[in-house]
Swiss-Prot record:
Name by which UniProt lists this protein: Keratin-associated protein 6-1
InterPro entries membership: KAP6
Subunit relationships: Interacts with hair keratins.
GO biological process: keratinization
Organism of derivation: Homo sapiens
Lineage: superkingdom: Eukaryota
Coiled-coil regions listed: none
Entry keyword set: Keratin, Repeat
The encoding gene: KRTAP6-1
Length: 71
């Protein structure tokens, strides 16, 4: 599962939010920044690492604001 997306929503560089234990989030190929933003079934648009962040990652929420490649 992807847990919750509170971490990304508020832009906190945390862990165990979107993707952790599910799609990975930061560095894993499917995490936020290297593929599908949070990958929580929705808002999977890639974010932060070369893709932007708010604009692509679910209307400003999903992967922080400014960067979505938190490890």
């Amino acid at each position: 599962m992807c847990g919750s997306y509170y971490g990304n929503y508020y832009g906190t560089p945390g862990y165990g939010f979107c993707g952790y234990g599910g799609l990975g989030y930061g560095y894993g190929g499917l995490g936020c920044g290297y593929g599908s933003c949070c990958g929580c079934g929705f808002r999977r648009l890639g974010c932060g690492y070369g893709y932007g962040s708010r604009s692509l990652c679910g209307y400003g929420y999903g992967c922080g604001s400014g960067s979505g490649y938190y490890y």
